[in-house]
Amino acid sequence: MQTISKASSATSFFRCSRKLSSQPCVRQLNIRKSLVCRVMKLVSSPLRTLRGAGKSIRVSKFCSVSNVSSLQIELVPCLKDNYAYILHDEDTGTVGVVDPSEAEPIIDSLKRSGRNLTYILNTHHHYDHTGGNLELKDRYGAKVIGSAMDKDRIPGIDMALKDGDKWMFAGHEVHVMDTPGHTKGHISLYFPGSRAIFTGDTMFSLSCGKLFEGTPKQMLASLQKITSLPDDTSIYCGHEYTLSNSKFALSLEPNNEVLQSYAAHVAELRSKKLPTIPTTVKMEKACNPFLRSSNTDIRRALRIPEAADEAEALGIIRKAKDDF
């Protein structure tokens, strides 16, 4: 088993240590322990313990105080670059899955753990987030939960949720947040007790989703809603896009030292075929260009007019990312 320890040579604000699993494609995050770790003042996130294929992976990254919870989160790669997330409550044995693009990887994981599936949660209607719904529902009798606005577009939906709803997953309160922009009916699912949010395709690490159905103004409001959460909130998004996103972000802010360190960390993880997710609210506020549309360097790089408001600037940044 290999161990990696990395510190940023430029700023020394970043430190990461991992034990690599022989099967890096599946990672399970256990946020039961409470630990304290401080790594500089710029960026922080909870200390997490990940487990995969029976071998433990220890991650110390932008650390502060972790949360105490019986909720386990297993990252499951699907399709080309999608992530689904299996949720398991240790106390009750309840299992859910967020955004199953396809059924087979979820079934394989549940077989390995000997677990059943109770809930299927969808952030939006796109096929690469709902493609496994019907097969999983038929196999396990799981209930499908999604946006009320998308109730006619989510396969097999049983329960429709709207902004402000609070739903209980095995004793864990889930706050439903409307986060349109990528699609009109997109929702994000926030677990305050675990400081974790599932953002689907609204927010990625260092980027946001394409504006297929919404407007820059809607996307800006959605991103602001997500980043109003505590800084140590872990963000679980729908795709592994972070490496390419980091290249775009650096093209706009080449002198951002936090971004430089994070981009180097991301490149190292991807070179070992390891996930870059979760990220944190604090990291994204420091590095994500879509959260920094008022930044002078970004505006200068894209020739965004001084008079342009944040929504207009976000639209210009999104167009530049589409063409990058």
Swiss-Prot record:
Belongs to the metallo-beta-lactamase superfamily. Glyoxalase II family. Coiled coil: none annotated. The keyword Nucleotide-binding does not apply. Its cofactor is Fe(3+); Fe(2+); Zn(2+). It is an enzyme of class 3 (hydrolase). It is found in: Mitochondrion. Fe cation binds at residues 128-129, 201, 239. One of its GO terms (molecular function) is iron ion binding. Pfam families: HAGH_C, Lactamase_B. GO terms for biological process: methylglyoxal catabolic process to D-lactate via S-lactoyl-glutathione. Residues 1-64 form a transit peptide. Its EC number is 3.1.2.6. The keyword Mitochondrion applies. Keywords: Hydrolase, Iron, Metal-binding, Mitochondrion, Transit peptide, Zinc. This is Hydroxyacylglutathione hydrolase 2, mitochondrial. One of its GO terms (cellular component) is mitochondrion. Binds 1 Fe(3+) ion per subunit. Electron spin resonance clearly indicates the presence of Fe(3+). It catalyses: an S-(2-hydroxyacyl)glutathione + H2O = a 2-hydroxy carboxylate + glutathione + H(+). Pathway: Secondary metabolite metabolism; methylglyoxal degradation; (R)-lactate from methylglyoxal: step 2/2. It comes from the Eukaryota. Thiolesterase that catalyzes the hydrolysis of S-D-lactoyl-glutathione to form glutathione and D-lactic acid. Monomer. Transmembrane segments: none annotated. Zn(2+) binds at residues 124, 126, 182, 201.
